[in-house]
Each structure stands twice: as C-alpha cells, then as structure tokens.
A protein has these predicted regions:
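Glycine-rich, charged/polar anion/phosphate-binding loops
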Residues: 23, 78-86, 125-129, 138-141
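Short, conserved charged micro-motifs
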Residues: 44-62, 102-115, 170-177
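Short beta-strand-to-loop capping motifs
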Residues: 38-44, 98-103, 164-168
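Core RNA-modification/binding signature centered on pseudouridine synthases
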Residues: 16, 113-233
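Short, charge-patterned binding micro-sites
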Residues: 7-43, 82
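Short, intrinsically disordered, mixed-charge
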Residues: 1-8, 62-70, 116-120, 180-187
C-alpha cells in the first residue's frame, strides 16, 4: 500500500494480499538476498507500472525500495510467467557459506571429505520416535574458499569459509544437522551460515531463480512481479 501497488487479494471472508516469499530462511541464518512473489490485480499490466523499459524498471525498484524498511532494497524486478509455480516449489538447491572464528581452513577441508562418503546416516525424531535417514544424497558439492575482502572484514577468524550446495528436495538437510556432520567436536549452534544462491532446474540446467542481469534486460509482461530484495545480515 505504501508503494502504491495494486496487489491482488485472495478470495474468502478475509481477503489477504497475494504476497509470498520464496524458500524460508532458517532461524539464525543470514542471506545475501531473498525473493518475493507479488501478484498484481488482473487489470494491471507491467506496462502500467513502467516495467517495459529499463528506465521504468529502475524507477520502479527505487520507488519500491523507498517504501521498505531501512536495510531492505529491491535490486531487480522481473515478470513471473503466467501459470508458474511458487518460488518455494521451484528452488531445488541452495548454496551456503559456513564459518566461525574458531574454524580454520583445515577444518573446512576436512569437512569436504564428506563428499567421499557413500552414506551419511543421521538420527531424526518424528512424532516422538527415532528414525534414521541417509542424507548423503542431499550434499551436492563442498569446497573451501576465502571470503571476499568486503565480507571477510566483518568476520573474525582467518577469512576462510566452507561453500556447500545442499538439496532442498524432499525433507532437506537442516543446517544444524549439516554442521554436526561437517564439524564434529565443534558446537553446531556456533557455526554461522549465509545463503548466497537459490537454484532451480530447467531445460538448460541449473540457473538462479531470478537472474539479475537477464531480468534487467527482459521486457516484463502481465501476471506478477518477482523482486529480489536484499536482506540485512
């Protein structure tokens, strides 16, 4: 309402704005950016919002950012194709960075050895009963790197991080469960995690849910908008 968007409403006795965020961010985790779906009224087109030109899209993102709380900025907006599923359902993989001041590059390298395991069985509690699950198929890739200088400056430690591609299909793997596997001997609750990418599978392979450079050049049409908003760390 503050941004002047004519948002579509759900049906029923208590209509609600059709606004939905993508894959939920786990409690305590950080994120580089998040996605949100905003359904517009059927009589509103992208051209009505000025989204059919580069200048119009820039003006739109600036205006929407100004209506958001301090620390949140809309960086790109694009059409969500008519009939497309929800953002949460489309995400199949997330890329994470894990670090802690007491974790070293060698700790991260040892964690990468999980890729060599055939199985990784953990115990989970369901409805008061313990069960076992093999979570090895959920760990798609692991490698270590040094964070960029702008990020490392705000972190204690040697600046190294573990980068993990984790599947979101099915029940998924909790960050705490992964941290316990990756860093035995360390308290998993102390391990920091930042989501850097959300991926979806398409005919051309894996791609970002919303690719910023492509979206900025695309001609938007009716249906809805899917802005990517930066979340504060």
């Amino acid at each position: 309402r503050r941004a002047g968007l004519l948002v579509a409403l759900s049906e029923g006795f208590t209509p609600r704005p059709k606004i939905s965020f993508g894959l939920a961010l786990p409690t305590g985790a950080e994120s580089v950016a998040e996605y949100v779906d905003i359904d517009l009224r059927p009589d509103i087109s992208a051209a009505d919002l000025g989204l059919d030109s580069l200048a119009g899209r820039r003006a739109f993102t600036e205006g929407l950012s100004a209506a958001l709380p301090i620390g949140f900025d809309v960086v790109v907006v694009a059409e969500r194709p008519a009939g497309a599923g929800s953002l949460q359902d489309s995400v199949t993989t997330c890329t994470w960075e894990f670090w802690h001041p007491r974790l070293t590059t060698e700790d991260h390298r040892r964690a990468c050895q999980l890729m060599a395991a055939d199985t990784l069985v953990i115990e989970r509690e369901r409805k008061g009963k313990l069960s076992t699950d093999d979570v090895r198929p959920l760990i798609l890739d692991l490698f270590t790197k040094f964070a960029g200088s702008d990020i490392a400056a705000g972190r204690e430690g040697d600046g190294s991080v573990l980068v993990a591609d984790l599947s979101t299909v099915g029940r998924g793997l909790r960050l705490s469960e992964f941290a316990e596997l990756a860093y035995p001997g360390h308290d998993a609750r102390d391990v920091r995690a930042m989501r850097t990418h959300q991926w979806t599978e398409g005919p051309d392979g894996r791609r970002e849910v919303l690719d910023a450079p492509d979206a900025d050049l695309a001609v938007a049409g009716p249906a809805g908008i899917a802005p990517l908003a930066e979340a504060p760390a």
